[in-house]
From Swiss-Prot:
It comes from Staphylococcus haemolyticus (strain JCSC1435). GO terms for cellular component: plasma membrane. Belongs to the glycosyltransferase 28 family. UgtP subfamily. Pathway: Glycolipid metabolism; diglucosyl-diacylglycerol biosynthesis. This is Processive diacylglycerol beta-glucosyltransferase.
Length: 391
């Protein structure tokens, strides 16, 4: 464990909530370890470097799932040599150099694809340990940083993807994607459902409007699911879309088997108490579902990491892809009317999930810090960071 004063710099990004959630899980775990010699700082590199342009890019990113799918698809699946010619590779370079000079971290942890880090590792022979947490289930080129000391990945399959891309197997740890440890705690499902006037004996279907307020078609889906699966009950989470919540509350106010929620901090309890979930295939959400052994239906996943995550979970029989609301309704009907199929998915998830992901990752981070202590004692931090001035 850490016996000298050490500092970890976490570089994250606010494109969606997942990267921030991973960062918070890691920070919380390290804080729980009560390491008096360790300090952890976190920075949203792109937002701090170029706040106006990054805000515009974030809006484009959010809208790309709805309006610009082909454009985002072309970006996501572009060849590595095309990325090298793109300004994105150098985005945030000056801010990153200034951060390193100011903070002088002993280890850098990336929880967001940060191609600009490649510029530093290729052009400056820095030997500060760099670790990367990949928050999706299939490899995408932006996650690879030359000379990185460690990659933390979700599964053995993801590890094979990295090895096939030329990363040494010894540099890759299968920890699972870091999520809050509350998703591994026991929940009294019967008490939770009764507390919300739901029937513990009925299959509970959890539906989420998604982080970006998708607000159309849920009334149609709820109505048709209940027609085809009348023995079920539905919990609809509208997130921050107050208009959607009001509309659905009015439409289903007389239904005792439909509960409409707004934003909730209790997704853990709802996942634990449900048998099936309709959601977006974001890396963190589906990792939480996997930890809870909750089969999922992915409605119309966007090209890119959403689709790749959904395809992986479908290949592993953890979930199913529905390209239209009608397909989602049919899948729900099939699974709830043939409970053995749903149970088979649940059992497979229970057998194959990786537990204690955040603890595994943080323990390895501390080992890296320990192993780098001797080198730091010999060379000191100043020569490492002085290299930025001699290039």
């Amino acid at each position: 464990m850490v016996t000298q004063n050490k500092k970890i710099l976490i570089i994250t990004g606010s494109f969606g909530n997942g990267h921030l959630q991973v960062t918070q899980s890691v920070v919380n775990q390290l804080n729980e370890m009560n390491l008096s010699h360790l300090s952890v700082i976190e920075h949203d590199l792109f937002m701090e470097a170029h706040p106006i342009l990054t805000s515009i890019c974030k809006k484009w990113y959010i809208n790309s799932f709805k309006y610009f799918r082909n454009m985002y698809k072309n970006f996501y699946y572009s060849r590595p040599d095309e990325l090298d010619k793109c300004f994105y590779k150098y985005y945030g370079l000056n801010k990153l150099i200034n951060l390193l000079l100011k903070e002088k971290p002993d280890l850098i942890l990336l929880t967001f694809p940060t191609p600009v880090m490649s510029v530093l590792t290729e052009q400056f022979n820095i030997n500060i340990p760099i670790a990367t947490v990949m928050t999706d289930y299939r490899l995408q080129k932006n996650w690879i940083t030359p000379n990185s000391h460690r990659y933390y990945v979700a599964t053995d399959d993801t590890k094979r993807d990295f090895v096939n891309a030329g990363i040494p197997a010894s540099d890759i740890k299968v920890t699972g994607i870091p999520i809050s440890d509350k998703f591994e705690s026991d929940i009294d499902k019967v008490a939770w459902l009764k507390k919300h006037n739901l029937n513990p004996d009925k299959p509970t279907i959890l539906m989420s409007a998604g982080a970006f307020g998708v607000s159309k078609g849920f009334d149609y889906m709820i109505d048709n699911i209940l027609q085809k699966s009348p023995q079920s009950q539905i919990v609809m989470v509208c997130g921050r879309s107050k208009g959607l919540k009001r509309t659905l509350e009015m439409q289903f106010k007389s239904y005792d088997n439909v509960l409409i929620l707004g934003y909730t901090k209790h997704m853990n309890e709802w996942m634990a108490s449900s048998q099936l979930m309709i959601t977006k295939p974001g890396g963190i959400t589906i990792s939480e579902g996997l930890t809870r052994s909750l089969p999922m239906i992915f409605l119309n996943p966007a090209p890119g990491q959403e689709l790749e995550n959904a395809l992986y979970f479908q290949d592993k029989s953890y979930g199913k892809i529905a390209n239209t609301p009608e397909e989602a309704i049919d899948i729900v009907s099939d699974l709830t009317n043939h409970e053995y199929r749903l149970q088979a998915m649940t059992n497979k998830m229970t057998e194959e999930k990786v537990n204690h992901s955040t603890y595994r990752l943080c323990t390895d981070l501390l080992n890296i810090l320990d192993s780098s202590s001797q080198q730091q004692e010999i060379y000191g931090k100043v020569p490492l960071y002085a290299r930025f001035f001699v290039k």
